[in-house]
Amino acid sequence: MNETNVNNNNQSNEEVEEINDEFKLYYDGLQESKHMKYYTNSFKSYENKQHKRVSSTLVPLKSEDLQSIRINTIHILAWKLNLMAVSYNSKFIFTAESDVINVRNIDNPNIIIKTFAMDTMEMTINQIRLGILDGEEVLVSVDEGGFVRIIFVNDFEREVIRLYNHGVSTWGIAICPSKPLIAVSSNSHKITIWNLDDENPQETKFLLPKHKHNIPSIDFSPCGNYLVSVSIDKNIRIWDVNKRQLLRIQTLAQWCWACRWIDLTTKEDQLYQYYNNSSNSRDNNNNNSNSNNNGGGGIIIDKSWRGLTQHEEQQLVENNQEVEPMPEEEEEEEEEEVNQVDNDDEIFQENDDNEENEENTEFLNEANDGVDDDDDLIIQNGVFTNEDDIIFDGGLPPINQHQQQQQQNQEIEEEGQEGQEEQEDGTENENNQGTIATTTTTTTTIINSIKKLEDAINQQRIENNRINSKVPLDKNKLPSNVVFSTYQNLYLSDVEMDLLLTMNNAIPTSFPIIQTQIDRIAFLEVVPELSLVIAASQGPARLISLYRIVKQIPLNNNINNNENNNNENNDNNLNEPETNMFLESVLSPPSGGPGLIVGLSVVKNYVKNNPLAFSINLYVMYINGIFINFHIKRSTIRNKPIHQNSTFFDPINKCNIFGLDITSFGV
């Protein structure tokens, strides 16, 4: 018995040394997947009938750390969402610190240029987001009290626009690039949309009230006609903003945290126009960079947008405090009738036993964020586990298979030890029999819980399919794809939400950690020009992964043609490009070990008449004040697999100009 314990201790020490070695390799900046103990794996939850095989044709990216500095004057709160943004001309850093927003010089971030006092009754800011609002660069903030603020980046002296979300803790922000629309999502389980072109946008706002839990992230499509939202209720929804109608819904097995549209268009004229518009806009911004000392130096657009006055906002706050809230069900029915939102989703009505969870509590309370209130949490190896793996037709993900095998091996070993103890001590034998009985009961409970959860999810999917089938979609009018995340996984989906590409354990790590609800992928950005998806974890992993999207004709496109000649649908499917996503690299953390990520911002760099030279600056801020600037670009433009049918094919360098869905061009 003692010898066995010694062997086990030696084995444990060896494992610790191995982990430490990998930990050292990791922090030495060796970010290749071979150094990762837990690495990302992709799963498809749909059946690929043609067994298509694809390969990457994208130029690898090159990442360089241009700047790494510690900001000593910063005071950012933990467990919020994104609290940092960088202006598009890379001149200013915006940091949300408690209830104020500080503007810092990017060359010396310790210098505060201006402070915006939000005048929000000291309500702490939950998130800020920078974007283009109907052609103008703005910064939007939301906070615990439902106060919404819009700052004009190109004119700091311009009056800040005030909007009010009725005292509800607000988290998600969506900025429409092509229309004057601002949307926010909150702990009221509703999405609020304002049209700033209206004379009184606060009165004409409308709601999308279908979610049944807090909504951390929303995003407008580039055209502004559609919106995607994700929620702690484990649902991702796609909305028609103009009709105020739910178009699609998909239910997952984990809390959802972030979402973005990514339009992998196959229309080259649209791509060319998009590039030219972006390039011209950047040129104009640069030409005006020295003309305005009070802001970001871009184009100042004179729009008659208005929000609330301070007096009007104060009156709304007082009225909101005086009026007793109506019951949740009556409130939703009234809002749905006023807003003419499609009410064909009775399966999402609130349950009485969930009423206690409808208070305006924070998303990100570290103390209560690790345990879900639903029945999908079971105990496995003494750890609460969310059984996400049942959504995959291919069985358990590898990590869960490994855990399951470890549990089985442990049970076998325990049974062998119990048999030995049986021969040595009769009293211990009785105890061991009790342990075996308890283990058997626990195993049965786990199996029953899994079956119960699987039945519930299957029933949910049936209802989702029923709802989805009632609203036909015109794919030509919709962006092609959405990217979204849960606390552990990353997803790429078509707009119909029936083809999910899942990256399990999407943030690799070189040291073993039990990934919990706290390890959430809360930061998500997309760069279509590089076919790039940037995902960052706010939890224990605290790392940033770079994913690439490729869409191309299968290599074995002609296989099984004879078998499918009598099936027109199969013939058509054989000619369709297939979309895939893969992990390309993981960015090195700052020296001294990573801290909690509190902000992530992307700035695009266009080069006139040379789209191959397109690059981005990825800015990352940690709670310990470390601020990093990564420069990411194509590693080379030569020796690249080519697709000569594309009008963007460059015969000199023998490569395609864009990484955006390049291999589907000309098909």
Swiss-Prot record:
The keyword Repeat applies. Residues 325-345, 411-428 have a biased composition (Acidic residues). InterPro entries: GATA_zinc_finger, WD40/YVTN_repeat-like_dom_sf, WD40_repeat_CS, WD40_repeat_dom_sf, WD40_rpt. WD repeats lie at residues 165-204, 210-249. Residues 278-301, 316-345, 389-440 are annotated as: Disordered. This is WD40 repeat-containing protein DDB_G0271002. Gene3D superfamilies: YVTN repeat-like/Quinoprotein amine dehydrogenase (2.130.10.10). Residues 278-293, 400-410, 429-440 have a biased composition (Low complexity). It comes from the Eukaryota. Keywords: Repeat, WD repeat. The keyword Repeat applies. Transmembrane segments: none annotated.
